[in-house]
Amino acid sequence: MKHIRNFSIIAHIDHGKSTLSDRLIQVCGGLSEREMAAQVLDSMDIERERGITIKAQSVTLDYKAKDGETYQLNFIDTPGHVDFSYEVSRSLAACEGALLVVDAGQGVEAQTLANCYTAIEMELEVVPILNKIDLPAAEPERVAEEIEEIVGIDAMEATRCSAKTGIGVDDVLENIVTAIPPPEGDPEAPLQALIIDSWFDNYLGVVSLVRIKNGKLKKNDKIKVMSTDQVWGVDRLGIFTPKQIDTTELNTGEVGWVVCGIKDILGAPVGDTLTLAKGGSTERLPGFQKVKPQVYAGLFPVSSDDYENFRDALGKLSLNDASLFYEPESSAALGFGFRCGFLGMLHMEIIQERLEREYDLDLITTAPTVVYEVVKTDKTVLYVDSPAKLPAINDLEEIREPIARCNILVPSDYLGNVITLCVEKRGVQVDMVYHGNQVAVTYDLPMAEVVLDFFDRLKSTSRGYASLDYNFQRYEASNMVRVDVLLNGETVDALAIITHKDIAQSRGRLLVEKMKEFIPRQMFDIAIQAAIGNHIIARSTVKQLRKNVIAKCYGGDISRKKKLLKKQKEGKKRMKQIGNVELPQEAFLAILHVGKD
């Protein structure tokens, strides 16, 4: 056991985490030259394309150290994006140490910091590494000081390497062996294994990545999943060297994969504990929580024939993604579809892109909303994730909106812009600390503002230097209203949005102006109105197309012209009564972009 090292890599997006892991695999000979692909561990196309890591992955490498001993290195790859922070904390719980990889050109960023604090709270050994020292812009001394100031760990001895060219990678491996402690655990104790991640394989069912904390796991053991109390037989188990290799047992401290015929990913939730069915442990490992979606949106297939395929596609995606929530929803305007819950906007974009790309579907998305806590007049509390479910105004006591605690790291030159942005988004400042040239600002912002476009706006006001980390804090009573959109006096349910009363008027006006551009002109006037309850707050009109009916009268009598105009007017009136308006898909997208311009 003392020759095992479990570690993960903490790094901000694009600081070279996946490239470094490629190098480690190459040096330890996990894959032959021919099998090396760039970013071996990012197995989904979309992960490679966007250059981000979404799912946690693991690799077991054998490394012959300079002291002549052979060490088993278990490396668990973690996602870096803020939407996937729960997966990060699960990956860290399985390790004894973490490599803090920082780009020697850019310095420390907020998500790195957030994950690093998580690691320190879990009492992991944090080993700083300065990457990309081959770049002309690299300033390792300055960045080392920054790490010491902001994170507070000793970085003067930090290993310098360049994952791309391979300089210093051997030093990194030596550092892992010397600085990170071996796993603790009792091989004789009852089995306790932490599920780091689960995914669905078409042939094997659910494959779980586990870390054995105590005891050992053998083939054909009967095991129990502690949160569901279901018992399964272990069919196969083994390790990844990135390739799946079968073994007969996993010992204390090791990380490997287990297949036990579970059909549904909810049967092996991430962060849960496995133990033996007979004589197993009674206590589960700490830190398990059910992942709650933060953002909801309605997804509808463009043609209703696709509904069945869409349902199957969602089912297949949710096998692999336990944090995706969906339930059927129908809308008068859009037909049948699903209300889906996501961790954040990035997660939503990724799911939508995967549905369109892998399952060939055309989808319409309604405006994303967060979950509101609603107190009705009879004191019952509801959780509302869609504007359509909001009770009528006279039944409402109050609406509480979710508040997110946002930690922003920004160079002091851009502090003013960032504060202006936070105030505009109804933020309340909690804290501000200067670290050298960087400022750490903490704000409480409404979740609805954060998920809409806060991240994009933050990046643009700070020229891309600010970084953000947020998590849900609490519900707070707020003056929220539902803005409905009416076309010719009829409500279109799919276009409603929930917004704050102070900005409802301007949002409403923006919305109707935006929609006016997208609705094609008809033979009659179309009134687009935004309303709160029965109170109209904004209106614009798409003008009718009309034929010049008096063109054929040569200078004729005025009464003749009046007669023709009156006849046209009556015809238009009749059309307006029976005519209905087709909404193009662009009109729905207009709503999504209303806050962004």
Swiss-Prot record:
GTP binds at residues 14-19, 131-134. Its main location: membrane. CDD domains: EF4_II, EF4_III, LepA, lepA_C. Required for accurate and efficient protein synthesis under certain stress conditions. May act as a fidelity factor of the translation reaction, by catalyzing a one-codon backward translocation of tRNAs on improperly translocated ribosomes. Back-translocation proceeds from a post-translocation (POST) complex to a pre-translocation (PRE) complex, thus giving elongation factor G a second chance to translocate the tRNAs correctly. Binds to ribosomes in a GTP-dependent manner. GO terms for cellular component: plasma membrane. The gene is lepA. InterPro entries: EF-4, EFG_III/V, EFG_V-like, EFTu-like_2, G_TR_CS, LepA_C_sf, LepA_CTD, LepA_IV. It catalyses: GTP + H2O = GDP + phosphate + H(+). GO terms for molecular function: GTP binding; GTPase activity; guanosine tetraphosphate binding; ribosome binding; translation elongation factor activity. Its EC number is 3.6.5.n1. Residues 2-184 form the tr-type G domain. Coiled coil: none annotated. Belongs to the TRAFAC class translation factor GTPase superfamily. Classic translation factor GTPase family. LepA subfamily. It is found in: Cell inner membrane. Keywords: Cell inner membrane, Cell membrane, GTP-binding, Hydrolase, Membrane, Nucleotide-binding, Protein biosynthesis. It is a peripheral membrane protein. This is Elongation factor 4. PROSITE patterns: G_TR_1 (PS00301), G_TR_2 (PS51722). It is an enzyme of class 3 (hydrolase). GO terms for biological process: positive regulation of translation.
